[in-house]
A protein has these predicted regions:
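Juxta-kinase regulatory segment immediately upstream of eukaryotic protein kinase catalytic domains
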Residues: 1-27
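Conserved ATP-binding subdomain of kinase catalytic cores across diverse folds
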Residues: 25-43, 47-174
Length: 174
């Protein structure tokens, strides 16, 4: 896809949302390995908002709608588990049709607020990053303990089999 086609597609997807202002910048974020991700700036008068727009990779996720349904189920569950003192959970913005994704040009797109000062690591520079990631993953697993698994669909075979994934991780670390 050319840059002009990419720009046209992104603008068409964003038109499905009730967003304030006009698009003042679109930057493709190249770190990350799965989805096509863009940082979008919107300006209205003297205010700028930053959003993250993603196209879900339908090669990795054969049915991207299952991914979005899982996210919706997890968000609904966590919204009832967390209080105001807990860390936030990313929510995808509903489009004008009230859906948390937009279908366009054969792709499934989703939009969420940009998290200021967020970092995506391509490589880990110190062990504290790994400790923090492990803590966050463990906390996430603990928070989901009461979520009925039948509410989630299998998006990748074995993806939700945490013991098997941990065995693979430990095997790879040896």
């Amino acid at each position: 896809m050319t840059e002009a086609e990419q720009d046209k597609t992104i603008r068409a997807v964003l038109a499905a949302y009730d967003l304030p202002g006009h698009i003042s910048g679109i930057t493709r974020l190249v770190n990350g390995h799965i989805n096509d991700t863009y940082q979008v700036q919107l300006e209205e008068e003297d205010r700028t908002e930053t959003w993250i727009l993603q196209r879900i990779n339908d090669y990795v996720f054969k049915d991207p709608l299952l991914v979005m349904n899982n996210i919706r189920a997890i968000n609904e569950y966590l919204d009832n588990q967390l209080d105001a003192n807990d860390c936030g959970v990313i929510h995808f913005l509903a489009n004008r049709d009230g859906i948390i994704y937009t279908e366009y040009a054969g792709g499934i797109w989703r939009l969420c607020p940009y998290v200021p000062n967020s970092v995506a690591y391509e490589q880990v520079e110190n062990s504290q990053v790994l400790v923090s990631a492990g803590y966050a993953f463990g906390r996430f697993q603990a928070l989901l303990e009461g979520l009925p698994m039948e509410r989630l669909a299998e998006t990748i075979p074995g993806f939700h089999d945490t013991p098997a994934r941990l065995r693979k991780l430990f095997d790879a670390a040896e």
